[in-house]
């Protein structure tokens, strides 16, 4: 099926990614580890823009940019150079930003996503290096603030800005692109997406193939999707009333879920770009072969290998490779000799599902334990051991625990009981699978006590069977196997 795109929606993204895995900033020796530091303590004359301070390029940042370009299947420039982008704003103490203009380090890449009609290619126009400005802290909301504080700890942080073609046709495709793009960056180990401000997105969107509007500085993938949904609705309403869309820059108010006009959209000439005289042009083609050798197995290749090596479904392979540390955890479990298909089910469906429900983000994996932090409160930490998943998968495969009991074990561990093994939890909670005679007795009692549901089922109401199974599970405190309970009920009622 071909997606017709009835509203003529075109979405392009500009993604600003901090290379926060590097030790020092883009053009000076200040540490990039500033997130728990007091304001304006990770600064120097270079990142404060003091007169006479000269930049020194961080070679590791260039290598990271090349690595990103190769992973995006882009062309690496034979020669690249920096420019000054001139504008006056409090977060930019020099009065200009050191960036790249007509000689970006990467061009003509692509990312393949799951689109509205199957696989969909999103073109990468360019990816270029630049420095991050400082951070403005508004007192109150951005609209009503009576004062602004400035923290220059972020000033000079190494950034890669990646610009896509307007190839996305819905907010859902835009979010899927961001998920895939972030996944690639995490596999490359160039940034930590759990840190504040690690990725910021500007979204350009138009409807009916018309004038585009830019929505600036969105900090989450969900926020991008929400902002685009609102902005598309707003533009369609303007056109429906006979109005015209103005090319402008808007801000997304996360709390209210609306976009707010900030200013008319600037053109490139408004920034008066000119070459940075304090940094020489670079020829980097000689670096490429060595950097290419360091590229890891990327998400698509790992997904294909998981399906072939472990015999798991495409859905499970996609979920498991959506985070590199989750993929490593799964392989750690499989290395212990358990059934990889059962391990995939419990890791991708249950463990990952619980993490999403609890708003926990994967933060570490050391070969033995996978760690999590709460997305909104990094002080909340949790973990899950490889050995615990191996034990749980083994108990389930041997028929010693039901699926409901296994889910209860995972939830109990994530509730802060990492020190207890699955067997201990099962013993304490009485979760070992019920004996057949106990299940048979529970089935008989359930049928006797629920005559109305029995008659509904016999009359063709299939959902009544689910109710009866639930009653059996309740009587056995979740220790019965749901499939066995269902089969026994059907056999008892229909012979």
Swiss-Prot record:
It holds the Pfam family GatB_Yqey. One of its GO terms (biological process) is glutaminyl-tRNAGln biosynthesis via transamidation. InterPro entries: Asn/Gln-tRNA_amidoTrfase_suB/E, Asn/Gln-tRNA_Trfase_suB/E_cat, Asn/Gln_amidotransferase, Asn/Gln_tRNA_amidoTrase-B-like, GatB, GatB_C_1, GatB_Yqey_C_2, Gln-tRNA_amidoTrfase_suB_CS. SMART domains: GatB_Yqey (SM00845). It comes from the Archaea. Heterotrimer of A, B and C subunits. PANTHER family: GLUTAMYL-TRNA GLN AMIDOTRANSFERASE SUBUNIT B MITOCHONDRIAL AND PROKARYOTIC PET112-RELATED, GLUTAMYL-TRNA(GLN) AMIDOTRANSFERASE SUBUNIT B, MITOCHONDRIAL. This is Aspartyl/glutamyl-tRNA(Asn/Gln) amidotransferase subunit B. It comes from Methanosarcina mazei (strain ATCC BAA-159 / DSM 3647 / Goe1 / Go1 / JCM 11833 / OCM 88). The gene is gatB.
């Amino acid at each position: 099926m071909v997606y017709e795109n009835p509203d003529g929606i075109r979405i392009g993204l500009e993604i600003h990614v901090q290379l926060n895995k590097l030790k020092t900033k883009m053009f000076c020796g200040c540490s990039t580890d500033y997130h728990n530091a007091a304001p304006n303590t990770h600064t120097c004359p270079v990142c404060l823009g003091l007169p006479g301070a000269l930049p020194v390029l961080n070679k590791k940042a260039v290598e990271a940019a090349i690595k990103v370009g190769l992973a995006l299947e882009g062309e690496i420039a034979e020669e690249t150079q920096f420019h000054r982008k001139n504008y006056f704003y409090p977060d930019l103490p020099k009065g200009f930003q050191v960036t790249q203009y007509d000689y970006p380090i990467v061009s003509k890449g692509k990312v393949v996503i799951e689109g509205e009609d199957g696989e969909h290619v999103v073109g990468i126009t360019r990816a270029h290096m630049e420095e991050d400005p400082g951070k403005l802290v508004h007192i109150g909301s951005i609209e009503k603030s009576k004062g602004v504080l400035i923290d220059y700890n972020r000033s000079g942080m190494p950034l890669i800005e990646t610009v896509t073609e307007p190839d996305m046709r819905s907010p859902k495709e835009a979010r899927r692109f961001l998920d895939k793009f972030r996944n690639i960056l995490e596999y490359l180990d160039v940034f930590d997406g759990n840190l504040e401000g690690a990725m910021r997105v500007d979204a350009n969107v138009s409807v009916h193939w018309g004038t585009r509007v830019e929505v600036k500085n969105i900090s989450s993938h969900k926020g991008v999707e929400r902002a685009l949904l609102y902005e598309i609705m707003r533009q369609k309403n303007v056109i429906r009333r006979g109005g015209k869309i103005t090319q402008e820059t808007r801000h997304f108010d996360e709390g209210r879920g609306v976009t707010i006009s900030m200013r008319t959209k600037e053109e490139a000439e408004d920034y008066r770009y000119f070459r940075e005289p304090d940094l020489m042009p670079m020829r980097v083609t000689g670096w490429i072969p060595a950097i290419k050798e360091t590229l890891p197995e990327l998400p698509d290749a790992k997904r294909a290998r998981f399906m072939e090596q472990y015999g798991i479904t495409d859905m499970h392979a996609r979920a498991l490779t959506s985070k590199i540390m989750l993929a490593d955890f799964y392989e750690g479990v499989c290395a212990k000799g358990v059934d990889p298909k059962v391990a995939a089910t419990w890791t991708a469906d249950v463990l990952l599902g619980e993490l999403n429900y609890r708003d926990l983000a994967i933060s570490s994996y050391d070969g033995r334990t996978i760690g999590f932090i709460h997305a909104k409160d990094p002080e909340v930490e949790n973990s899950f051991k490889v050995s615990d998943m191996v034990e749980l998968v083994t108990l389930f495969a041997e028929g010693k625990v039901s699926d409901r009991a296994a889910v209860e074990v995972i939830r109990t561990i994530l509730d802060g009981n990492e020190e207890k093994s699955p067997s201990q939890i099962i013993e304490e909670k009485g979760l070992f699978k019920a004996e057949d005679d106990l299940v048979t007795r529970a089935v008989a009692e359930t049928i006797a006590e629920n005559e109305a549901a029995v008659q509904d089922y016999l009359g063709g109401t299939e959902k009544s069977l689910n109710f009866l199974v639930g009653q059996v599970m309740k009587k056995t405190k979740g220790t019965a196997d749901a499939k066995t309970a269902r089969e026994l009920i059907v056999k008892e009622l229909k012979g």
